[in-house]
Amino acid sequence: MVTTYLLFIVAYLLGSIPFALVVGKIGYGIDIREHGSGNLGGTNTFRTLGKKAGFTVTIADILKGTLATSLPMIFGLDIHPLWFGLAAVLGHVYPIFAKFRGGKAVATSAGVLLCYSPVVFAILAVVFFTLLFTTRYVSLSSMVTAVVAVIASIVSGDKIFIIAMCLLAGMVIYKHRANIGRIINKTEPKANFSKKQK
């Protein structure tokens, strides 16, 4: 039982690692919280620091979700891995290492899915990028993909999967509430795929 509690803490701490902040400060000498949207996630990193930093942060945020979700398998615990994934996402959104001001749960949630259901992860990746290249709204693509994740979990019939996806989708949509207003008002920034970035 003690091991279980410790691993939940480890999962939260993994999620709390603010890779956007680390990359910004070490690689570029800036605090990304003071630039762009101020969000500690991949999208703000792409827009503020460029493609190289953006890809680095996004991949790192995905992998911390994957690693956290795999903890019970690594240590042979008979506990559903999605609970550890949820702990990592909570850490990503409310990181203890960055004054509880983190990202919007998208990349780390993707990492959780990558570990738990690679097939669903692949389907959602197609949905996300199709929406992104069609609408050019990262936020809208993220929210719609989160809803599709809930639908996929319902189809699976896995009760814990359904609960986890509902919680993650709720978190993603809640963290994008300001984006929803900007989309309605047509002031939400669009992804610019032709713009030259670092």
Curated annotation (Swiss-Prot):
<dbReference type="GO" id="GO:0043772">
    <property type="term" value="F:acyl-phosphate glycerol-3-phosphate acyltransferase activity"/>
</dbReference>
<dbReference type="InterPro" id="IPR003811">
    <property type="entry name" value="G3P_acylTferase_PlsY"/>
</dbReference>
<feature type="transmembrane region" description="Helical">
    <location>
        <begin position="113"/>
        <end position="133"/>
    </location>
</feature>
<comment type="subunit">
    <text>Probably interacts with PlsX.</text>
</comment>
<dbReference type="GO" id="GO:0008654">
    <property type="term" value="P:phospholipid biosynthetic process"/>
</dbReference>
<comment type="similarity">
    <text>Belongs to the PlsY family.</text>
</comment>
<keyword id="KW-1003">Cell membrane</keyword>
<feature type="transmembrane region" description="Helical">
    <location>
        <begin position="147"/>
        <end position="167"/>
    </location>
</feature>
<dbReference type="Pfam" id="PF02660">
    <property type="entry name" value="G3P_acyltransf"/>
</dbReference>
<keyword id="KW-1208">Phospholipid metabolism</keyword>
<protein>
    <recommendedName>
        <fullName>Glycerol-3-phosphate acyltransferase 2</fullName>
        <ecNumber>2.3.1.275</ecNumber>
    </recommendedName>
</protein>
<comment type="function">
    <text>Catalyzes the transfer of an acyl group from acyl-phosphate (acyl-PO(4)) to glycerol-3-phosphate (G3P) to form lysophosphatidic acid (LPA). This enzyme utilizes acyl-phosphate as fatty acyl donor, but not acyl-CoA or acyl-ACP.</text>
</comment>
<keyword id="KW-0812">Transmembrane</keyword>
<comment type="pathway">
    <text>Lipid metabolism; phospholipid metabolism.</text>
</comment>
<keyword id="KW-1133">Transmembrane helix</keyword>
<feature type="transmembrane region" description="Helical">
    <location>
        <begin position="4"/>
        <end position="24"/>
    </location>
</feature>
<keyword id="KW-0808">Transferase</keyword>
<keyword id="KW-0472">Membrane</keyword>
<keyword id="KW-0443">Lipid metabolism</keyword>
<keyword id="KW-0594">Phospholipid biosynthesis</keyword>
<dbReference type="GO" id="GO:0005886">
    <property type="term" value="C:plasma membrane"/>
</dbReference>
<feature type="transmembrane region" description="Helical">
    <location>
        <begin position="71"/>
        <end position="91"/>
    </location>
</feature>
<keyword id="KW-0444">Lipid biosynthesis</keyword>
